[in-house]
């Protein structure tokens, strides 16, 4: 008789922009937020929010909170700004994924869910541009 612990799946959403990294861990349906952390929550200076180190600390904080609530396996969804913004994730995406993997979660799948337009998109600022 082997006493296997039941695997509870969750979804880790990593939003990595050029200015911050947000990590949200939800249940498998996505309806209930289990833990949430960002680069700005774990560092003191604003200029350190987008750093890989802040992303790693935020991922560790979210992971420990999710572990305490019973999540043992996660699917990871990585997202950049998308739309008229950057289509590539910011500097905190890779360290956040690595920290979630090292935290002891079973990793299901990692996918990029950045919103990409299938036609052109109109940038903000209007016809004559942003007047400074």
Curated annotation (Swiss-Prot):
GO terms for molecular function: rRNA binding; structural constituent of ribosome. It holds the Pfam family Ribosomal_S11. One of its GO terms (cellular component) is ribonucleoprotein complex. SUPFAM superfamilies: Translational machinery components. Keywords: Ribonucleoprotein, Ribosomal protein, RNA-binding, rRNA-binding. InterPro entries: Ribosomal_uS11, Ribosomal_uS11_archaeal, Ribosomal_uS11_CS, Ribosomal_uS11_sf. GO terms for biological process: translation. It comes from the Archaea. The keyword Cytoplasm does not apply. Part of the 30S ribosomal subunit. PANTHER family: 40S RIBOSOMAL PROTEIN S14/30S RIBOSOMAL PROTEIN S11 (PTHR11759). Located on the platform of the 30S subunit. Belongs to the universal ribosomal protein uS11 family. This is Small ribosomal subunit protein uS11. The gene is rps11.
């Amino acid at each position: 008789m082997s006493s296997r612990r039941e695997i509870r799946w969750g979804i880790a959403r990593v939003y990595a922009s050029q200015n911050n990294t947000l990590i949200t861990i939800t249940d498998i349906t996505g309806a209930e937020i289990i833990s949430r952390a960002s680069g700005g929550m774990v560092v003191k200076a604003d200029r350190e929010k987008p750093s890989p180190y802040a992303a790693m600390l935020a991922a560790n904080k979210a992971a420990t909170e999710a572990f305490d609530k019973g999540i043992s396996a996660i699917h990871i969804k990585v997202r950049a700004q998308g739309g008229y913004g950057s289509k590539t994730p910011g500097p905190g995406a890779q360290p956040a994924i690595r920290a979630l993997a090292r935290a002891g979660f079973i990793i299901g799948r990692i996918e990029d869910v950045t919103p990409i337009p299938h036609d052109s998109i109109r940038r903000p600022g209007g016809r004559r541009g942003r007047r400074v």
